[in-house]
Amino acid sequence: MNFFCFAIVFLLLVNNYRLQNYEIIINYFVPLHKIMTIIAVVLGYFALLFAFSRWTGRRATNETFYRADRQSPWYMVAFGMVGASISGITFVSVPGMVLTSQMNYLQTCMGFILGYVVVAFVLLPLYYKLNLTSIYAYLGQRLGQRSHKTGSWFFLLSKMTGAAVRFYVVCIILQRFVFEPLGVPFALTTVLLVLLIWLYTRKGGIKTLVWTDSLQTLCLFTALLIIIYKVATDLNMTMGEAISAVSGHELSRVFVWDDWVSKQNFWKQFLSGVFIVLVMTGVDQDMMQKNLTCKTLRGAQKDMCTYGVAFLPANLLFLSLGVLLVMWYQQHGLTLPASGDELLPGYVEQTSSIFHLTSCLFVLGIVAASFSSADSALTSLTTIYCVDILGQKDNEQLRKRTHLGMCAVFVLFILFFKVVNSTSLIDAIYIICGYTYGPLLGLFAYGLLTKRVVNDRLVPYIAVASPLLCYAIDYGVGQMTGYRFGYELLMLNGLITFAGLYLSSKGQDD
């Protein structure tokens, strides 16, 4: 019922804008026909999401919303987590990475695998042993109440900001390909999309997401594979010929061993990949919440190792698409985009006037990737605020109000980011991650690697000072040597936090 009500309102809005933009319809009938085809595909996709929501939301309680009653099949969690972790940023930005760094990103993906193994066999056993709903409750038990609150607030800031960056992708893509020609303002586009998320997650929460993420992952990779096939066909290649062309292309270089200064050096990329997973998965409530819904610890470990390994071939597909797109641009005598983020959208714009399928698949892939990230982020933010900040895990009415409030704040963050963003989307995510996730890494590392009692009163100040000091070091080194920290910013930030905690607890032991 929710879906059909929304569909009626949506179509009325579209009809209203069509009436207001009568001249646009007359002059651009074919583009609008394409737009309506995209809208039909997206509405059909959301009809499936709402069907899953209706099924999983029956007799849902707070325990269902937060932990899916600890009954999720591990293989469904693993499959869904691939799509949830990839996001719309990957769909747009990773193919374009070949323009500036070839296939060097696969070095980071190799580090991801080791990172997931560490999380599966070090952190997951701890979380299951303590039977946690929120992983930041560990900080309260090990370090103290202020440490608990500090970790929770840093996650709220980090996740809200990072998720807004990711969801910004789907908003600008749909605005560009669908809503802008109809005269719909960006703000309304954003509100409509976030409203959809709220509607299909408001009852079942994380239980709904385990199943909808699997559907979204399936749609994402179906769209990706068909687009790859479409580009190869445009190049008059069979799939075998396309594979050979990609593997022999100058942009297919993976490893950088010889340049220690370069940000693309193998060991910098590999170690950054390990720490990115430790932070963005191991101490991230959003990523861990689904893993904590598995029936057993062994099931959770199997799911994490499975999707950890899957990241390498998944990103290889995206990068291979990037190489094929470069070949397509060159074959058609077109200038390559100045920004890698425009590589795939540019291809879609060039071909979608002839093939509606291209634009439909592109939008479907973007929507599937971005919604699987945003919906789980909003669920985890609601969980943290209710369970950790307010300490009212069982208050169902509070949880419902908080979920709606988080959606409203999410919209504001997206609109703010649209105004201030001026960097590559994929780099923006890791810049934000480096400055806001670093203290989380330091807090968990201190709790796990030492037995010393922290000075809990000073923890909030240390956590705030660490990113500021990290930024000062990055700026100072850049001014003096020209070197800028890359993904290793995570490690530096975590190390500064760890050192601050250690010095503040000098002479105190458990």
Could you say what each language-model-derived stretch is?
Residues 20-35:
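Short, Lys/Arg-enriched N-terminal segments with co-localized hydrophobic residues
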Residues 31-510:
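Membrane-embedded helix-loop-helix hairpins and adjacent transmembrane boundary segments
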